[in-house]
Amino acid sequence: MLQENGVTEWSPLFSEPHPSREFCVQYGETDYDFLCRMAAEEGIFFYEEHAYKSTDQSLVLCDTVRHLPESFEIPWNPNTRTEVSTLCISQFRYSAQIRPSSVVTKDYTFKRPGWAGRFDQEGQHQDYQRTQYEVYDYPGRFKGAHGQNFARWQMDGWRNNAEVARGTSRSPEIWPGRRIALTGHPQANLNREWQVVASDLHGEQPQAVPGRRGSGTTLDNHFAVIPADRTWRPQPLLKPLVDGPQSAVVTGPAGEEIFCDEHGRVRVKFNWDRYNPSNQDSSCWIRVAQAWAGTGFGNLAIPRVGQEVIVDFLNGDPDQPIIMGRTYHHENRTPGSLPGTKTQMTIRSKTYKGSGFNELKFDDATGKEQVYIHAQKNMNTEVLNNRTTDVINNHAETIGNNQMIAVTNNQIQTVGVNQIETVGSNQIIKVGSVQVETIGLVRALTVGVAYQTTVGGIMNTSVALMQSSQIGLHKSLRVGLGYDVKVGNNVTFTVGKTKKDDTGQTAIYSAGEHLELCCGKARLVLTKDGQIFLNGTKIHLQGKEQVNGDSLLINWNCAASKSPPKTPDEKQDTPDMREY
C-alpha cells in the first residue's frame, strides 16, 4: 500500500513481533486512515528520516523509543532578542493530566471456546493520579497470547499525553523521530531527555516580497515532547463499522461444488470486491451459522459454491464476517414452482457433482396434506428401542428387488379380515422348533403339480369331525415298520375295478361276530359260534394231492345243510365324504 501511494523508501524498526493477520479489511476509510489505524493497533509510530547532506528522506516505522537516534543537547534561553546566533528553546511548558490508568481487554475465539481471552495492563508513571480509571475493551480483536501486547500498546496509547511539554524554538532540527536533551532550564527536573512527538514549523521572509521590508528571515518551531524514558504510541482509533448485513457469493476452486474447512467454514466474494478473483482465495474462511449446533449434534448444511449468502459482522467488525443465511435468486431457483407450491415446506439436497437429490417435503394443501421422503440411493433407519407405525387407512409397499426381514426374538402378525399372499416362484419356510397353525373354519390347499411332506420324527394328524382325501390318479402309501388303523364304527372300501392285498408272510382277517366274503351268488360266512357257511350255485373242491376232511358226522345230500345267516345291518351314521 505504501508503494501504491508513492512511498518507495521506508524501513521497519521493530523490537517486538507483529504477526500477520488472518483477515484484515480496509472498509470505508482512506489509505492513510487505514495505515494509521493499523499502526495504532500494533503500537507502531512512524516518522520521516531526513538525510543531513542531501534531500533524501524515508519513512520509518518504529515500535520503541530505543531505536530513535541519539539525543542532541539544546539549551533553554527565554530571551531570544539578546542571543540569536545560538539555536535554543525559548518557551517550554510542562503539563500533566489524568489519563486512563489501566486497560482490560477481552475477546473470544471459537477455536478455543473455553479460553479466558483476557489481558490486564496497568499504566506506568501514575504518581500524580488515582488508579481507578479503567478502559474495558471488548472485543479486543486478538486470538491468542498476542493480546497481552495489544493491551500494553493500547495502555501506552491512552497515556501518550499524560505528561507532555510544549515549546518553541528556532531550531529546524526538532522534529518527530528525534530525541533532545534540554539544558539550562531553571526547573532542574526538566533538564532531561525528551522524545519529540510533534513539530509545526512557521517561517517568514518579508524582504523576499517586493515592496516590503522587515527584520529579516525568521523561523519558529512549535513542538511537543514527552519524557524519553517511555515510548510514545498513537491512541487507539475508532474502527469503521459495517452498518448491516451484506450479500456475497460462495466461492471455491474451479470444478468444485463444496469447498469448506474442518469447521464448516467457506469462502465468499463480496459484491463490492473489485480485486479478488472468485476462487479459493477470495476471502478468509467465514463461519456459517446453523439452525442448531451442539457437541456432536445439531444441524449442518454447508453453503455450496455459487450460492448467494447473507453475511453479517460480529459487533459490526468488517474483519469478523459470519454467514447468517442464504437466499435464492433468479438463477438459483427454489424447489418446486412458486407460487403454485406455496403450501410446501421442502428440504432438498443435491447429489455432489450430479443431478440427483434427497428430499423431505411437507405439503400443507387443504385436503392434500402429505409428507414425502425421497432417497436418491440408500435409506437407512436405526431405532434403538421401539418403533410404532400407525396407518389408519391403507398401506402399500412395493419393492423392486429383494426384501430381507430379520427378527431376533418374536414376530406377531395380526390380520383383521383377509390376507392374500402370492409368491411368483418358490417359497421356503423353515421352522427351527415348533409350528402351530390354527384355522377357525375351513382351509383349502391347492397344489398344481406335486406336494410333499417330510417329517423327521413323529407326525400326528387330529381331525375333530371329518376328513376327506381325494386323489385324481394314484396314491401310494409306504410304511417302514408298522401300520395301525383304528376306526370307531364302520370302514367302507369301494374299489372301482381291482383290489389286491399282498402280505409277505402272514395275513389275518378277524371279525368279532360275522365275517363274510361275497362275490355275486357265492358267499363264505364265518360266525362267532364257529359255523362256516359256504354257499354258491356250484362248489368245486380240487386237491392236486389230497382233500381231507374230519368230523364225527358228515352229511351229504340229506337236507342237513343250513343257509348262511344274513349280513348284519350297518348303522350308516357317517356321511359320504365324496359328496363334499
Regions found by a protein language model. Give the residues of each.
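Extended, domain-scale alpha-helical bundle/helix-rich regions
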Residues: 3-9, 16, 24-228
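Short, conserved helix/loop micro-motifs enriched in His/Cys and acidic residues
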Residues: 9-23, 281-291
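Structural signature for extended repeat/solenoid scaffolds and their inter-repeat hinge/linker regions
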Residues: 44, 61-64, 243-535, 540-542
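Short helix/loop capping segments that flank catalytic or ligand/cofactor-binding pockets
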Residues: 47, 69-72, 100-107, 113-119, ...
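Intrinsic-disorder/coil detector with helix-boundary
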Residues: 58-59, 68-72, 505-507, 512-580
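A generic local secondary-structure boundary/capping motif
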Residues: 90-95, 213, 237-239, 256-257, ...
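Extended boundary segments
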Residues: 111-143, 231-274, 344
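Acidic, low-complexity/disordered segments
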Residues: 187-248, 324-330, 334-345, 562-565, ...
